[in-house]
């Protein structure tokens, strides 16, 4: 009795239909040429952490709830006197998601979190970097259902970067559109 391994919904959708759609659209000769999701990087800068070290730890705990894996606290590299910032002071946190956790996060982002954003009109289609990666910013991290605002009491913004193996923005846009990213028209 062999057990079947768990496959995230979006990964199965990519394997079954999206890969063939992209192959037909762009005329790839090899399966490995088809763009795929590589990683998702979540970054949260916490400005209040300059005065209170616990804010960065609290942000890292919230990000761990959102991402499903432990967040790494980021530290300042240089001192900036106008911001009262010293070197090696905690200023935020980040997480890099790959494989199954990446697909699960993107599924929750598209189906649950983005519809909860106030006055959401779609994602900016111009936020590609020229090499097939897409970045978006979220003003409040409390749009994720894992975060209880009553317990947190704080609301921070976060950056989400979706890295793909696509060589051009058009290929990456086609890939993310196939994953039902809600781009503005």
From Swiss-Prot:
SUPFAM superfamilies: RL5-like. One of its GO terms (biological process) is translation. The keyword tRNA-binding applies. Signal peptide: none annotated. Keywords: Ribonucleoprotein, Ribosomal protein, RNA-binding, rRNA-binding, tRNA-binding. It comes from the Bacteria. Pfam families: Ribosomal_L5 (PF00281), Ribosomal_L5_C (PF00673). Transmembrane segments: none annotated. One of its GO terms (molecular function) is rRNA binding. GO terms for cellular component: ribonucleoprotein complex; ribosome. This is one of the proteins that bind and probably mediate the attachment of the 5S RNA into the large ribosomal subunit, where it forms part of the central protuberance. In the 70S ribosome it contacts protein S13 of the 30S subunit (bridge B1b), connecting the 2 subunits; this bridge is implicated in subunit movement. Contacts the P site tRNA; the 5S rRNA and some of its associated proteins might help stabilize positioning of ribosome-bound tRNAs. HAMAP family: Ribosomal_uL5_B. Belongs to the universal ribosomal protein uL5 family. Part of the 50S ribosomal subunit; part of the 5S rRNA/L5/L18/L25 subcomplex. Contacts the 5S rRNA and the P site tRNA. Forms a bridge to the 30S subunit in the 70S ribosome. This is Large ribosomal subunit protein uL5. The lineage of its organism: Bacteria, Pseudomonadati, Pseudomonadota, Alphaproteobacteria, Hyphomicrobiales. The gene is rplE.
């Amino acid at each position: 009795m062999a057990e079947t391994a768990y496959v995230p919904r979006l990964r199965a959708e990519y394997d079954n239909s999206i890969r063939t759609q992209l192959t037909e659209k762009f005329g790839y000769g090899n399966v490995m040429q088809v763009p795929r999701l590589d990683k998702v990087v979540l970054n949260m800068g916490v400005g209040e952490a300059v005065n209170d070290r616990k804010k960065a730890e609290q942000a890292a705990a919230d990000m761990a709830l959102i991402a499903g894996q432990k967040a790494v606290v980021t530290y300042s590299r240089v001192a900036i006197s106008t911001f009262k910032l010293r070197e090696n002071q905690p200023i935020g946190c980040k997480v890099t998601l790959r494989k199954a956790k990446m697909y699960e996060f993107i599924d929750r982002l598209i189906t649950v979190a983005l519809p909860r954003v106030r006055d959401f009109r779609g994602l900016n289609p111009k936020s590609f970097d020229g090499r097939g990666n897409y970045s978006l910013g979220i003003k409040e991290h409390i749009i994720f259902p894992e975060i209880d605002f009553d317990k947190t009491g704080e609301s921070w913004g976060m950056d989400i970067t979706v890295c793909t193996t696509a060589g051009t923005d058009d290929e990456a846009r086609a890939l993310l559109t196939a994953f039902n990213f809600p781009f503005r028209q």
